[in-house]
């Protein structure tokens, strides 16, 4: 008996490494000293006076179930990168490098490569290097054809350029940056609504969406790195990545207890997919705002005097952005 008999194919793992090396190479920056293949990725830090390293880790959650149902694996890697880098940039940091963890019961290189291609694409959009990762073959641990992902991102910022959320005060404006769709949160509820309660198939064409349900649900999470870079000349007082917990749980993370975010519903158009979920699932409005991004993937808080310039810069790079509310004196966290 050997390791392969027990369900772990080392040769398949080595084959995968050879396949992904050239893919990862397309993401490398001048600061990468050693990337995929070594025991560790090496990254050199230059030209910083008082640097602070910022780290984040995340996954894609049960959105992966949609990828399995569709047998489409080339976009979930973008989701993985987005979930990590969007958390890093809210501090004022620039993403430097990324690592991934891919775990499956029986390794299929062709599937794994599609995932890695998505990760590399996400890294290129975010301007960070894919310098390493781990592929784990765990026989008997996952259902056939299924896998799980985790991502790890490190960014950097000068200490004096860290976003100071303590400066947020009454009257500050809340700018919302449009999401690309559901992003990567709330999929357990999404699957319950569409597939269990209403017996939809991922192949069903949804006229309101103009596409098959599966394609709509797999739309990649938006990466906001370039959008936030466009605002670097302005004083950003705070940012919130609208992920699990939606508006209700994420925006208060950057607010003092004496102030709240008053959101003006109707100041942006809620994407059709959320209206469908709410109607088909008979979900209360506040629950929607606590589960989903509702069309706003990133919130940026600025002084009212900077609003016009911020919108001009964002619109100038093709970013859809809206003034969606203001900061008020209250202990309510988020007021809808």
Swiss-Prot record:
Give the UniProt subcellular location, in the record's own words: Cytoplasm
This enzyme's EC code(s): 6.3.3.1
Which reactions appear under catalytic activity for this entry?
2-formamido-N(1)-(5-O-phospho-beta-D-ribosyl)acetamidine + ATP = 5-amino-1-(5-phospho-beta-D-ribosyl)imidazole + ADP + phosphate + H(+)
Record's keyword terms, sorted: ATP-binding, Cytoplasm, Ligase, Nucleotide-binding, Purine biosynthesis
> Pathway, according to UniProt?
Purine metabolism; IMP biosynthesis via de novo pathway; 5-amino-1-(5-phospho-D-ribosyl)imidazole from N(2)-formyl-N(1)-(5-phospho-D-ribosyl)glycinamide: step 2/2
Q: Which domain of life is it from?
A: Bacteria
Gene Ontology biological process terms from the UniProt entry:
'de novo' IMP biosynthetic process; adenine biosynthetic process
Q: What class of enzyme is it?
A: ligase
In the record, the note on similarity to other proteins reads: Belongs to the AIR synthase family.
What is this protein's name?
Phosphoribosylformylglycinamidine cyclo-ligase
What species is given as this protein's source? Thermoanaerobacter sp. (strain X514)
């Amino acid at each position: 008996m050997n390791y392969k008999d027990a369900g772990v194919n080392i040769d398949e793992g080595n084959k995968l490494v050879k396949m992904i090396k050239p893919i990862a190479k397309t993401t490398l920056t001048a600061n990468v000293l050693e990337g995929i293949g070594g025991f560790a990725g090496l990254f050199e830090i230059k030209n910083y006076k008082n640097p602070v390293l910022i780290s984040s880790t995340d996954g894609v959650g049960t959105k992966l179930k949609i990828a399995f149902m569709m047998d489409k694996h080339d976009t979930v890697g973008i989701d993985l990168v987005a979930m990590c880098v969007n958390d890093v940039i809210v501090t004022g940091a620039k993403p430097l490098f990324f690592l991934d963890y891919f775990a499956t019961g029986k390794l299929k290189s062709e599937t794994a490569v599609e995932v890695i291609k998505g990760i590399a694409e996400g890294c290129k959009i975010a301007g960070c290097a894919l310098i390493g990762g781990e592929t784990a073959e765990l026989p008997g641990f996952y259902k056939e054809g299924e896998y799980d992902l985790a991502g790890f991102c490190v960014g950097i910022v000068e200490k004096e350029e860290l976003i100071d959320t303590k400066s947020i005060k009454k009257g500050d404006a809340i700018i919302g940056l449009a999401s690309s769709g559901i992003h990567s949160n709330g999929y357990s509820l999404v699957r319950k609504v569409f597939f269990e309660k209403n017996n939809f198939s991922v192949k069903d064409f949804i006229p309101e969406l103009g596409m098959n349900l599966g394609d709509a649900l797999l739309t990649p999470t938006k990466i906001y790195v370039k959008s936030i870079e466009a605002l670097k000349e302005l004083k950003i007082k705070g940012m919130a990545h609208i992920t699990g917990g939606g508006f209700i749980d994420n925006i208060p993370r950057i607010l003092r207890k004496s102030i709240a975010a008053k959101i003006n519903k109707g100041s942006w158009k809620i994407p059709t997919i959320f209206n469908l979920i709410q109607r088909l699932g008979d979900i209360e409005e506040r629950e929607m705002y606590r589960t989903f991004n509702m069309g706003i993937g990133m919130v940026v808080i600025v002084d009212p005097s900077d609003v016009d310039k911020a919108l001009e810069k964002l619109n100038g790079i093709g970013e859809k952005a809206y003034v969606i509310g203001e900061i008020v004196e209250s202990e309510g966290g988020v007021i809808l």
